[in-house]
């Protein structure tokens, strides 16, 4: 009876540790898996548009990262904190104001709507970054032609 309980408990631990992680899905090298998507930090300075185009040219058609929950925001913040140097302060994310006249028409570059937001102090600029000063947890808008590092979010290989 004791052996049965030990085996059952062991299987339960394995199941719980794999559930919700996208187990069985493969990410490219240097990428991290979180809830069925692969995230990769690129240490190349690009404009917002060039970074988005770069992500879309990935074999799985990715986009600049969209952040749709507090949990995902924490994951991305930890990913950036673990991969950055002391002088790296900004990363492009996939949020953009679509129409200069209507700030409320923001959406993610992957087409998803903004259901969670962590907007910091805003200026009238169209593209958004995560900033080191906020622990990479707040979104700030910047001129789209500035060059920053970026994070791509792509579907994994099945």
UniProtKB/Swiss-Prot annotation:
GO cellular component: extracellular region
Subcellular location: Secreted
InterPro entries named in the record: C-type_lectin-like (IPR001304), C-type_lectin-like/link_sf (IPR016186), C-type_lectin/snaclec_domain (IPR050111), C-type_lectin_CS (IPR018378), CTDL_fold (IPR016187)
Glycan attachment points: 82
Tissue-wise expression: Expressed by the venom gland.
Pfam families, sorted: Lectin_C (PF00059)
Disulfide feature: 27-38, 55-152, 127-144
GO MF annotations, alphabetized: metal ion binding; toxin activity
Highest taxon of the lineage: Eukaryota
Keyword hit for Calcium: yes
Signal peptide region: 1-24
Main subcellular localisation: secreted
Subunit comment: Heterotrimer; disulfide-linked. The heterotrimer consists of 1 heavy chain (a metalloproteinase) and 2 light chains: LC1 and LC2.
Something else known: Binding to prothrombin and protein C (PROC) is hardly detectable.
Role description: Regulatory subunit of the blood coagulation factor X- and IX-activating enzyme. The enzyme activates coagulation factor X (F10) by cleaving the Arg-Ile bond and is also able to activate coagulation factor IX (F9) and protein S (PROS1) by specific cleavage of Arg-Ile and Arg-Val bonds. May serve as an exosite by which the enzyme recognizes and binds to the Gla domain of factor X (F10) and factor IX (F9) in a calcium-dependent manner.
Protein name listed in UniProt: Snaclec coagulation factor X-activating enzyme light chain 2
Organism listed in the record: Daboia siamensis
Gene: LC2
């Amino acid at each position: 009876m004791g052996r049965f309980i030990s085996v059952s408990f062991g299987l339960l631990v394995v199941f719980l540790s794999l559930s919700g992680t996208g187990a069985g899905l493969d990410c490219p090298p240097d990428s991290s898996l979180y809830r069925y998507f692969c995230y990769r930090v690129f240490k190349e300075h690009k404009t917002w548009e060039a970074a988005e185009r770069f992500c879309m040219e990935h074999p799985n058609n990715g986009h600049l990262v969209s952040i749709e929950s507090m949990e995902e925001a924490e994951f991305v913040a930890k990913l950036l904190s673990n991969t950055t140097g002391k002088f790296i302060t900004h990363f492009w994310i996939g949020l953009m104001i679509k129409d200069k006249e209507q700030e409320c028409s923001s959406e993610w570059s992957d087409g998803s709507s903004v259901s969670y937001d962590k907007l910091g102090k805003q200026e009238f600029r169209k593209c958004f970054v995560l900033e080191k000063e906020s622990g990479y947890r707040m979104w700030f808008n910047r001129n789209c032609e500035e060059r920053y590092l970026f994070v791509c979010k792509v579907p994994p290989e099945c």
